[in-house]
Curated annotation (Swiss-Prot):
Main location: nucleus
Transmembrane segments: none
Protein's name according to its UniProt entry: EKC/KEOPS complex subunit GON7
Function recorded in the entry: Component of the EKC/KEOPS complex that is required for the formation of a threonylcarbamoyl group on adenosine at position 37 (t(6)A37) in tRNAs that read codons beginning with adenine. The complex is probably involved in the transfer of the threonylcarbamoyl moiety of threonylcarbamoyl-AMP (TC-AMP) to the N6 group of A37. GON7 likely plays a supporting role to the catalytic subunit KAE1 in the complex. The EKC/KEOPS complex also promotes both telomere uncapping and telomere elongation. The complex is required for efficient recruitment of transcriptional coactivators.
Annotated region described as Disordered, given as residue ranges: 16-37, 82-110
Intracellular or extracellular location(s): Nucleus; Chromosome, Telomere
UniProt subunit comment: Component of the EKC/KEOPS complex composed of at least BUD32, CGI121, GON7, KAE1 and PCC1; the whole complex dimerizes.
Organism: Debaryomyces hansenii (strain ATCC 36239 / CBS 767 / BCRC 21394 / JCM 1990 / NBRC 0083 / IGC 2968) (Yeast)
Amino acid sequence: MLDPLVPTAVYKAPDFTEGQKFHPGEGPHTTNGKTTQISDIVIKAGGEDRDKPSDAKDTQLGQLRAKLTTLQDQLNIFLTKRMDHEKSRSQEEKDLERQVLDEGVDDDSD
């Protein structure tokens, strides 16, 4: 039987000619997301995840919940990589600007 409850997402931005599509895939799926847990720093300091979700029930809605967690992980990873790329690109532009200002413009028009 085909599962009718399969979430999908499409990320659109002006710099994307086509939207970035996300699909949870075949699994396995869990409600314990990779990107929605408390940070490793907090865990190492003895912190506890008090908001940890319950396991998904073996029902259509339970499986949908787990697939949504997978989809959320995919989106979070994609957006984090995108932000890191933008940050490094911005830093490269700042470095280039600083280099031009420090060295001046080479004007050979004399």
